[in-house]
Design a protein with these regions (language model features):
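Generic N-terminal initiation segments characterized by hydrophobic and/or small/turn-forming residues
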Residues: 1-3, 17, 92, 107, ...
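Short, intrinsically disordered, low-complexity terminal/loop segments
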Residues: 1-2, 123, 160-162
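Short amphipathic secondary-structure patches
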Residues: 49, 54-128
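Transmembrane beta-barrel outer-membrane domains
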Residues: 21, 120-122, 148
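Low-complexity, S/T/G/P-rich flexible repeat/linker segments used as non-globular hinges
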Residues: 130-162
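A generic fold-level signal
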Residues: 12, 121-122, 152
């Protein structure tokens, strides 16, 4: 009768299965986390490519445009084509005098006369495309997540236009 507990204690069969059962949830959480991070990073890259596409339109224009609203439309169209409908694009256009940002607008022409005589001036256009990423397991515990568990993601591109 006393031999049965010793026999069970010495038996090693099934130990690996129990260890796997203890470790499997950890490994599953690790894989799900990696998949979530890679999907979020992929979304960021596609939004950035959408912003780059809009900047390419600015670079391709032969004239100096004074209205850049078409850039935002191009960026949202490119983001929708990439599979991210509901994206918003913000277009910034500003003038720098001697490397200092002096004025910002959403498309009105900025005259170099805003700079003092002898100052170097430059005009810039930038596009930011934004959307929200919903993880596989949405939670407010994720860094930067909103109340719905979604994480805001954006892509940025800019160019000097003069």
């Amino acid at each position: 009768m006393m031999r049965l507990p010793f026999a069970i204690k010495a038996d090693q069969r099934g130990a690996a299965l129990i260890e796997l059962a203890l470790a499997a949830p950890f490994f599953a959480a690790l894989v799900i986390g990696m998949v979530d991070m890679s999907r979020a990073y992929s979304m960021k890259l596609k939004l950035e490519q959408s912003a780059q596409r809009a900047i390419e339109k600015v670079q391709a224009s032969a004239t100096k445009p004074t209205d850049f609203t078409y850039v935002g439309t191009e960026a949202t169209t490119a983001a929708t084509a990439a599979g991210y409908s509901g994206s918003t694009a913000t277009v910034d256009y500003w003038l720098e005098c001697n490397g200092t940002k002096t004025a910002e607008t959403t498309g009105a022409p900025l005259s170099p006369s805003n700079c003092s005589d002898g100052e170097t001036y430059a005009r810039y256009v930038s596009v930011t495309v934004s959307n929200t990423y919903t993880p596989l397991f949405a939670s407010r515990a994720w860094p930067g997540a909103n109340a719905q568990g979604q994480i805001p993601i954006s892509g940025y591109a800019g160019v000097r236009v003069q």
